[in-house]
Every structure is written in structure tokens, then in C-alpha cells.
Amino acid sequence: MVATTKQDRIYNKQKNGDFDLATTRWGPDYGDPTTYLTMGISTNSNNYGKWSNSEYDQLVDQVGVESDVNRRWQEMKDAEKILLDDYAYIPVFEKGAATLQNPKVKNLVIKPCRTISFEYVEKTE
């Protein structure tokens, strides 16, 4: 059965885990996979499904302090696998934004999470 409710109650119902299926909005805060992975940590306030997996939490914590980029990447892949195999979570990402750019500006990189890289920017005449 589908039940409708007023907008002001939806957030509270989700926050309290009072739902069978729910959608919500959220977008990445920065250009690193951990912006997504931290959403599944058992103590994350956006973890509305109250999912908890101590192995996952430990992996994501380790990713936060790992200095070896190859190990860090593998730990993120391992955490993602746990998240997608064990958690009833379907990440859907669609974000739109308009950007005006002077045609004389070349090689400006705007990533999907809206971070901008000026590393290779050139201005032509």
C-alpha cells in the first residue's frame, strides 16, 4: 500500500526509520569517493535505513587515514562491495547546473560534483 503524507512529516519519518521504501535528496560535497561511502556508516545522520555493518564502518574509517593510494583505492572498492551487496540502497545521482564560459577560456574542467579544476586552463585570443 502506498501512503502519502505531508512534506514536513516525511523527513521525520525517514529520520526515525518509519518507512518501507523512501527516496531522499543528497549530493556529493567533494570530489572523492568517500563522500558517498560515508553515507553508509552506521553513525551517519543520513543513514535513514539504520543499516549497520561493523566491517564496513572499519573499512571506511581506515580509508580516512590510509596514506598509500593503492591500498586506499582497494579499501574503497571493498567497502563499496559490502555496501552494494549488503545494504538495500540504490544510489541515483542526477545533478544539473548551467555554466557560462567565455569561448576564449579553454581546458576548464568541471567535474560532476561541481568541483572545478583550473590546472590546465588557458585563455586564447
Name each model-derived stretch.
Residues 7, 11, 15, 34, ...:
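Extracytoplasmic/secreted envelope proteins and their assembly/folding machinery
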